[in-house]
Curated annotation (Swiss-Prot):
Annotated binding of ATP, by residue: 115-122
The protein's name: ATP-dependent Clp protease ATP-binding subunit ClpX
Residue positions binding Zn(2+): 8, 11, 30, 33
Alphabetized NCBIfam families for the sequence: clpX, PRK05342.1
Taxonomy, superkingdom: Bacteria
SMART domains, sorted: AAA, ClpB_D2-small, zf-C4_ClpX
Length: 411
């Protein structure tokens, strides 16, 4: 066939009628047909994504917070911040085709700041439960950068994949909660010349997966080695929530506030009149950097929510009100044995008082309840007692419960 007679095998246009004509074994395709084929494939992919997204009904921020309210007592501001951040995160994913090219919506990873036992992990867990997305928890203190003894950051993603039943597409829209994130702060503000195995190096390793990358995950876990096969997962749509107590950061915030409010018109409250939460609500990225988080890592967590220490009243509500309240759980378990158990108001207050003494927030409630209920759940079904009331006496003597004491209190 002469050059003049060469035609596109698909549309029949001659070489002169098109910009390019690509030759294959016995066939030719023009640039316009290549573009058309590309557009068809793109459209089909887009339709598949839209079908996938239609299955996921994105709840509004109010609905998300209402669900959180059923499990998490208090923390109103944190729940509101988290609800909006999560809504925007998934809206960014599922409405991607409607976002104009000149706008780029940043990923809204979340940093939760608050003392131990105030509900940081529970908030993240409850969100994943409500949205029906895969969820994984990691402890930042067990992570090390590549080449050191410890856990690779990619193992976090392996847990997420496992919890998604090895469905990579589902895992790519999951939620990862990284606890104790403050424990990997570097030891000083200045970048260290020597290696910081548990601090800056881990932040750098996490940074890659948090900001969005194609990560290579070893399917068996453990360390990577050159001869194993990897699972590839795109992390750009995974929501990362990090939590930590950041003990001492309030001093950094106070120092900055005191300096910036010196002079005419200063309206800062005296230190003794400001609560820890009031101080922490003024946290800015520079405070986190001074604490020891690297600027790039701080920049990848644009949403910051501060959780308040739990008051006695809040602990009392946590004990009795949520769907998963400990009192409700133990009542349900004993009712299966035909035992009706009740707690006096004074007994509940005693449990809270004992939990406060442990200084571990809501975790203290579980510790006290487990100590109290161990012998009750062991003895009551065996004694044939059908109705029992827990009193403060029993709470304070929970490690000395005997059959005689139970019979006496039941009688």
């Amino acid at each position: 066939m002469s050059d003049k007679n060469i035609r596109c095998s698909f549309c029949g246009r001659t070489q002169k009628e098109v910009k390019k004509l690509i030759a294959g074994p016995g066939v030719y395709i023009c640039d316009e047909c290549v573009k058309l084929a590309y557009d068809i494939i793109e459209e089909e992919d887009s339709e598949e994504i839209e079908e996938e997204n239609q299955e996921f009904v994105l709840p509004k921020p109010h609905e998300i917070k209402n669900f959180l309210d059923q499990y998490v007592i208090g923390q109103e501001r944190a729940k509101k911040i988290l609800s909006v951040a999560v809504y925007n995160h998934y809206k960014r994913i599922f409405m991607r085709s409607k976002i104009t090219e000149d706008v780029e919506i940043q990923k809204s990873n979340v940093l939760l700041i608050g003392p131990t036992g105030v509900g940081k992990t529970l908030l993240a867990e409850t969100l994943a439960k409500f949205l029906k997305v895969p969820f994984a928890i990691a402890d930042a203190t067990t992570l090390t950068e590549a080449g050191y003894v410890g856990e690779d950051v990619e193992n976090i993603l392996l847990r997420l994949i496992q919890n998604a039943d090895w469905d990579i597409k589902r895992a790519e829209k999951g939620i990862v909660y990284i606890d104790e994130i403050d424990k990997i702060s570097r030891k000083s503000e200045n970048p260290s010349i020597t290696r910081d195995v548990s601090g800056e190096g881990v932040q750098q390793a996490l940074l890659r997966i948090v900001e969005g990358t194609i990560a290579n995950v070893p399917p068996q876990g453990g360390r990577k080695h050159p001869y194993q096969e990897f699972i590839q997962i795109n992390t750009k749509d995974i929501l990362f929530i990090a939590g930590g107590s950041f003990e001492g950061i309030e001093k950094i915030v106070e120092k900055r506030l005191d300096v910036s409010n010196i002079g005419f018109g200063a309206q800062i409250e005296p230190k003794n009149r400001k609560s820890l939460t009031q101080i922490l609500n003024h946290i800015i990225p520079e405070d986190l950097i001074k604490f020891g988080m690297i600027p790039e890592f701080v920049g990848r967590f644009p949403v910051v929510a501060v959780l308040e220490p739990l008051s006695e009243e809040a602990l009392l509500k946590i004990l009795t009100e949520p769907k998963n309240a400990l009192v409700k759980q133990y009542k349900a378990l004993l009712s299966m044995e035909g035992v009706e158990i009740n707690f006096t108001d004074e007994a509940l207050k005693a449990i809270v008082k004992e939990a406060i003494d442990k200084a571990t927030g809501a975790r203290g409630l579980r510790a006290v309840m487990e100590e109290l209920m161990l012998d009750l759940m062991y003895e009551l079904p065996n004694l044939g007692i059908k109705k029992f009331t827990v009193t403060p006496e029993l709470v304070y003597n929970r490690n000395k419960i005997s059959q005689d004491l139970l019979k006496k209190l039941a009688g």
